[in-house]
Amino acid sequence: MKRIVVVSGLSGAGKTTAMGFLEDLGYFCVDNVPGNILEELLKLFMSSDLEKMAMAIDVRSEHLGDPISTVERIKEKTNALVIFLEASTEELLRRYALTRRRHPLQKDGLGLEDAIEKEKEILSHIKEIADVVIDTTRMNTHQLRETLAHFLVNQAGGTSVRIMSFGFKHGIPMDADFVFDARFLPNPHYVPELSSKTGLDSEVEAYFKNYPVVEEFIEKIFEVLKVAIEEYQRTGRRIITVGIGCTGGKHRSVYITHRLKEMLEREGFTVIEKHRDIEKV
């Protein structure tokens, strides 16, 4: 089965890294697809021996046609996976300061921060129709490639669920569709023999088994996610991201994330488990 991936997103958010990774995976990569040759390009790909093609579409494509309508047409005509990359304005400013590159919308006296905000506005609809939105604010190159690999593995299937534990003190994952707050639950951090362990350790699991409210909370989240996933499958959504947060992202959120993965997999769902802050202090 032929695969098509569309990569869009904010300048400086990692599109070059993403396209390089896709090329390493054997995708035929096309940068800034002109809208007026899209139909011909798709026909050539479908009739060729190529199995995988990736297309990058961003604000630089504006002089070659409307990037939004281009992405919409690709989604209408193919089973393409649309990936949108973003990062916080502060992080994009930092990255541009390091590279000293000029933002593609920085012209006619427009400052960098204003150019970033203008780009967010232009591409907002592509973000809305994307199958996957990845916030790269706290990601390095390796983590972005790893995240892309997870999504690409599941491209051919139905709706996949990405469950991420995190610590609120390290920031909420901006790409999460759902965020659940576990900070009200008993905290093993204050038990000396458990403080250095994580929610993946059997001793921490045994601790949580003493508190029925923990299992009740997990069951409630599970029921919500089941309803949401089934509805997303009906509407064709490929990926949903769920954030489970506690204070530091080491005990409560990790345990709940792992338990939910097991429960959802038993229901036949494809689940990606990630513990963002488990190694942080």
Swiss-Prot record:
Binding site for GTP: 58-61
Gene3D superfamilies: P-loop containing nucleotide triphosphate hydrolases (3.40.50.300)
Cross-referenced InterPro entries: P-loop_NTPase, RapZ-like, RapZ-like_N, RapZ_C
Binding annotation for ATP: 9-16
Key word Cell membrane present: no
Keyword terms, alphabetized: ATP-binding, GTP-binding, Nucleotide-binding
Highest taxon above the source species: Bacteria
One GO molecular-function entry: GTP binding
NCBIfam families for this protein: PRK05416.1
PANTHER family, alphabetized: RNASE ADAPTER PROTEIN RAPZ
Family designation: Belongs to the RapZ-like family.
Role according to the record: Displays ATPase and GTPase activities.
Protein name according to UniProt: Nucleotide-binding protein Tpet_1006
